[in-house]
Amino acid sequence: LASRRQRQMCIRDRSSGKTILKNCAIEPEIKDLTKFLSQAGANIKWSGRTCTIIGVNSLNQTSHTVMADRIEAGTFCVAATLTKGNLQIKNLDPNIINTEIELLEKVGAKIKTSGNKIFIKGPDKIKPIQNIKTKEFPGIPTDLQAQLMVLMCKSVGKSSITESIFENRFMHVAELQRLGAKINIQNNKALIEGNTKFIGAELMSSDLRASVALVLAAIVANGKSIVGRVYHLERGYE
């Protein structure tokens, strides 16, 4: 996992000798951490998914701006697509969400990029995608799976989402069904009917990404919805 590799990089950087990490995650956050540590004096080299770290005695003071949260940005892009919104996102390298941009364009969103800005306009009708599959970067991130499921519920036809990263990542489905979603789970695949008319309901979030998916669904539902356990949401969204 990316977070595990990040911890290993920080630990190994101060150890003596050479450490080689193989089959590493290559998410932008990993490369951003590499940039920060290198600025501080670390000796880190990459070759594909292999990271070689030569230990150093000490690290120097440095200044570094942490990159934007691509999952948060992707969530807002989904929100704009879902609500026929008109959104501008600043201070984000569009290249880190290229795959997400391509998918949202397929469903009908109009998206333009300029420097570190993204402009997105939601479509009048959301087109279904027959097989969305979560993958490691640069594929569709598992952390956007729940949000995309809400989007597909509002599409004009049938679609499916395959979760290939984590087990038991469909805990939000039962709550979406409370709102009226027609979703059938077959192992790690969700079959989604589309054309859903969400009706407000009391909902319970089970984790960070599920909670924001429920909020998105509630936004486009008829009537009042109450989402419980919002402390999950507060871990990843301001």
What are these regions (language model features)?
Residues 13-14, 36, 41-70, 81-82, ...:
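Self-splicing inteins and homing endonuclease
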Residues 1-11:
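Single conserved hydrophobic/aromatic residue that forms the stacking wall/gate
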Residues 71-73, 206-214:
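Conserved phosphate/oxyanion-binding catalytic-loop motifs
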Residues 139-192:
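C-terminal structural cap/anchor segments
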